[in-house]
UniProtKB/Swiss-Prot annotation:
UniProt region (Disordered), positions on chain: 1-24
Phylogenetic placement of the source organism: Bacteria, Pseudomonadati, Pseudomonadota, Betaproteobacteria, Burkholderiales
Any one GO CC term of the record: cytosol
Gene3D superfamilies: Ribosomal protein S20 (1.20.58.110)
Source organism of the structure: Bordetella avium (strain 197N)
SUPFAM superfamilies assigned: Ribosomal protein S20
Protein name (database record): Small ribosomal subunit protein bS20
Domain of life according to the entry: Bacteria
A GO molecular function held by the record: small ribosomal subunit rRNA binding
């Protein structure tokens, strides 16, 4: 239990940050799933468009340090390779 005013405030901030970060992580996972679903359908145009949107989401989440920049690069690289493999 937080005893000082500062500790109580930090506890409140932590709860709010956790909600916000969870929302961003969920948005990231959803964007990645949408690209994978588009790849599964085999439509390169739709997959390319969803990849563009997902790349934006991945970069935003990485910029906010929700995920590491290398993890973001890995996600983008693998998704782009999968979209490129569609012929």
């Amino acid at each position: 239990m937080a005893n000082t005013a500062q500790a109580r405030k930090r506890a409140r901030q932590s709860v709010e940050r956790n909600k916000h970060n969870s929302s961003l992580r969920s948005m990231l996972r959803t964007a990645i799933k949408r690209v994978r679903q588009a790849i599964a359908t085999g439509d390169k145009a739709v997959a390319g468009e969803t990849l563009r949107k997902a790349s934006s989401v991945i970069d935003r989440v990485a910029d906010k340090n929700i995920i590491h920049k290398n993890k973001a690069a890995r996600h983008k690289s693998r998704l782009a390779a999968a979209v490129k493999a569609l012929a």
